[in-house]
Amino acid sequence: MDPTSKRPPPAASSSTTYPPLPKLEILNPSALPSHRFLRPAKRINEGPDVSHFLTSKAYRDIGVWILQLNHALVPRIIKKSTTVSTSEPTTDGQQQQQQQQQRQQKAEEVDEQQQPPPPPPTDALAAKLQLLRKKRDEQQPTTTEEIKTFPLPRYRDGEGVENQEESESIKKLQRLLKKVEAIIDEAPPDPGPRRFGNVSFRTWFKLLEERADGLLREYLPGGVLRWEQGAGGEKKEEEEGTETETETETEGDSDKKTNEQKQEVVGPLEELKAYFLGGFGSAQRLDYGTGHELSFIMFLGGLWKLGGFEGEENDEDGEVERRIVLGVVEPYLRVIRRLILTYTLEPAGSHGVWGLDDHSFVPYIFGSAQYTRPISSPNEPTPLEGSVPNAPKPSDITKPTAVERYRTENMYFSAIGFIYDVKKGPFWEHSPILFDVSGIKDGWGKINKGMIKMYNAEVLSKFPVVQHFPFGSLFQWEKDPEAGVPVQSVHMQNQPVASAAVTGGVGIPTERPSGPGGVTGTAAPWAQAPAQAPAAGIGAGAGMAPPMTAAPWARSTGAGAGAGVGASAANRFTPFKPAGGPGGAPHTGPPPPESFPSGTPGTASNQFAVTKAPWTK
């Protein structure tokens, strides 16, 4: 087992008090008459728009929601008060005898209170009473600690969660996912030859679009439907073709074609539907990636905002959030994996072999949280290092037998197990970044911290990933008044500046953006022409090899650390800011081509140098 899991760092004292952790705001139903739901629209059309996104209210809400779910999965230390004997251990018979003596003693005490004082006891009786009082005094109250973890619920193939007590809202969402999965049987894959994804996925997606309204009305939690019932005025405006103008863009956007965008007023289900449908891939491109995964996560965030999970649980310690992740997010990932296998969906916005995973990211965040060092208070911050006792070692992901054992209880290993299902060959060869992460020696808390930083840098700060995320009234394009100005970095300078493809429907592009020379396709991130000369120390020229994207926390700290995309923006709230550090998204520029970066001995960056891929020796 992991050495760090046997001797985890000491948890904070139970007497320590912490301020409440940030949570995603739940909208007040009394604001319904004045709240206008908007049809989500595409706003990120070119690279510089990412800079605005990193200062928007939507970005703030995404960060808060991801960390709210993440913190709920961290193991807890449960304190229990018990009464134990300070004498030597006794057998069952001796324990029964002691209990009988205690009952006899209590009866004698009652008799003493009700009857006049007895005559002086004999020596034998006095000795017996003295022995009973001594044993009573040896029974002292004590506090024991129990570690509570949150594994995945047991699944039965084709039947969902087994023997799992869930709230009504979670059960409804599970039934919704079962209905979505059942549509696969109505759209079997096309048997003909193909180079990319199976065209039958478009048939499946069309069926989902046609049934989405009915499915959402039937299976969304009741707390959300009350907004739909009270949105009659907004629906009437929609039918009459009424439109509302959103706030004017920032002053820096004055050179764009228009400073204002018009968004159609709709009902709450119509706004939620955009994020729901966006969570199941692109029918046009026949692909699925982390941007689609983000859309579904924020669909759940929209349900949270509308009170879909409110009032059903005692949520003092993140119980509702845990049920959302374990009871909804994991079943959603299972549906997605079946879609990928059935229709051979292409990775969307992937770095290829140098990406963390072809299709997903959040299971690595939530799965590492499941094995993080336990906390003793609901508001104690997520540990940055250490592991729960008896957790598997991070290096166990390279052992198929260990992966098979843990994939049914942990989201990290479940995602690794899917990689083993679809890829062959040495693990270090097809998944080098995950292989590097397996060398971390500071426990699962260190991995969890790094995954969150990497998510901010490689998902939320990358144009190819976030360009299709739509903005409405639940997740607003409007600037967060507490946001700072994002730092311009090499990544920001290399963002594409050409206008994106024309969009339709819920903001999904109807055609691929044109690449260099008019070639249509999704170019690799490093293939973008730089907007200006590269910074000193960064190689240039047409013959430069594509850079390797190593895990962000594997960088050596020093001048310029944390100066990546959105560094300042991330500093404005706790979610993507490492405790005690400079904060912000890490610098993810290319390392020296001849080897992986090496850092100070005993640090994570040095550990990555030890676990570099074999061909770098």
From Swiss-Prot:
Biased segments, Acidic residues type: 239-252
InterPro entries, per database record: Phstyr_phstse_ac (IPR004327), PTPA_C_lid (IPR043170), PTPA_sf (IPR037218)
SUPFAM superfamilies (alphabetical): PTPA-like
Domain of life of the native organism: Eukaryota
A UniProt-annotated Pfam family: PTPA
Keywords, comma-separated and alphabetical: Cytoplasm, Isomerase, Nucleus, Rotamase
Entry keyword annotation includes Ligase: no
Biased amino acid composition, Low complexity: 94-104
Region (Disordered): 1-25, 84-169, 230-261, 376-398, 572-617
Record localization: Cytoplasm; Nucleus
Biased composition (Pro residues): 1-11
EC class name: isomerase
GO molecular function: peptidyl-prolyl cis-trans isomerase activity; protein tyrosine phosphatase activator activity
One record GO biological process: mitotic spindle organization
Reactions catalysed according to its record: [protein]-peptidylproline (omega=180) = [protein]-peptidylproline (omega=0)
EC code: 5.2.1.8
Gene Ontology CC, one term: cytoplasm
Composition bias type Polar residues, residue spans: 84-93
Assigned protein family: Belongs to the PTPA-type PPIase family.
Record function comment: PPIases accelerate the folding of proteins. It catalyzes the cis-trans isomerization of proline imidic peptide bonds in oligopeptides. Acts as a regulatory subunit for PP2A-like phosphatases modulating their activity or substrate specificity, probably by inducing a conformational change in the catalytic subunit, a direct target of the PPIase. Can reactivate inactive phosphatase PP2A-phosphatase methylesterase complexes (PP2Ai) in presence of ATP and Mg(2+) by dissociating the inactive form from the complex.
Protein name: Serine/threonine-protein phosphatase 2A activator 1
Organism: Neurospora crassa (strain ATCC 24698 / 74-OR23-1A / CBS 708.71 / DSM 1257 / FGSC 987)
